[in-house]
Every structure is written in structure tokens, then in C-alpha cells.
A protein has these predicted regions:
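Non-catalytic terminal segments and appended small domains
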Residues: 1-60, 66-69, 77-83, 90-164
Length: 164
């Protein structure tokens, strides 16, 4: 899996961004297509916001549109991240590993930690709304310069209310 590197001083330099996938910047998710099936997952930068993943909760969906929530992930400080789909289509598979070992989402975001597989309805259209690893890194550097809340605000949901 080739990777696009960044200048050592760039804020995104510490993150792996494989060049063999497409990225949806505002949601910080990626997609990789093979034989009409898109494997999707979260990016390493989003994983840093989560820091710790005690739970991945899948939403009961069969068909998804771009941006629609596939799952939510609880992170540190009770923050919940919505994992939005970068492609439209029919859900083929949810990663069963994440139920048993949710930490795989962060430990191997581009490998065993994928979130779902989707039969893409129109990959060409969806791909046009995504960016390459190089473009995502550039967007990420600009957004990180404005602050983490600005950069990751599109994926974050409100903290969960404390249990009574």
C-alpha cells in the first residue's frame, strides 16, 4: 500500500495516508474500490481524536447515501463520532472484528480496522466527491492549522449524556 508523505513540519506528517484510496475530508473516512465493492473506514487523523475506542455501534441500514451514518464510535471524554459513508449503495458487510476488538479501528485503520463494505451504486459519481491522499493531506494541514475542533467538527457528535 503506497503512501503519500508530507514535509516533516506539516501538521499531518505523523499520519499514514495510503495513496491507493480516496478520502472524504469533512467526514474523515476513506474508500477503496474492488470489483464494485467499496471497503470503507476511518482515517488515522480521526483516530487521534478518538484516542480510545471502547465501542463501535453499527446503525441498522441496508442502503446508504454519501454522508449517511454507518456506525458511531465512542471515543475519549464520551465524544461520539459518526462514521459517514463515502459512497452510496447497498451494505454488503459490517466488520465483525470491531464488535470483538473495537481497538482495531484505531490500531489498523487501513487494514483490519475497516468499518463496512458497500456495493457502490455509482462509484464514478461518488469518487468525484472525494479526494486523493495528497489532496486530503493538504486539506488536513489547512484545517489542523485552524484547530482540532474546526478540523474534526464535521464528524463529532455531542457528548453522550451521563447515565442517571
Amino acid at each position: 500500500m503506497p503512501e503519500i508523505s508530507a514535509a516533516a513540519t506539516a501538521p499531518s506528517a505523523r499520519f499514514a495516508l495510503p495513496s491507493d484510496r480516496q478520502y472524504l475530508p469533512g467526514r474523515h473516512v476513506w474508500a477503496q474500490i474492488e470489483d464494485g465493492i467499496a471497503t470503507v473506514g476511518v482515517t488515522a487523523p480521526l483516530g487521534e481524536v478518538l484516542w480510545y475506542t471502547p465501542e463501535v455501534e453499527y446503525w441498522a441500514v441496508e442502503r446508504v447515501d454519501v454522508g449517511e451514518t454507518l456506525a458511531t464510535v465512542q471515543g475519549r471524554s464520551g465524544r461520539t463520532v459518526a462514521v459517514g459513508s463515502p459512497v452510496a449503495g447497498t451494505l454488503v458487510e459490517l466488520n465483525p472484528l470491531l464488535k470483538r476488538a473495537p481497538h482495531a479501528l484505531l490500531a489498523q485503520p487501513y487494514g483490519r480496522g475497516w468499518v463496512a463494505r458497500i456495493s457502490a451504486r455509482c462509484w464514478e459519481r461518488d469518487e468525484a466527491g472525494m479526494v486523493s491522499a495528497r489532496a486530503y493531506r493538504k486539506i488536513l494541514d489547512g484545517d489542523l492549522a485552524l484547530g482540532r475542533e474546526f478540523c474534526f467538527g464535521g464528524a463529532l457528535l455531542a457528548p453522550r449524556p451521563a447515565a442517571a
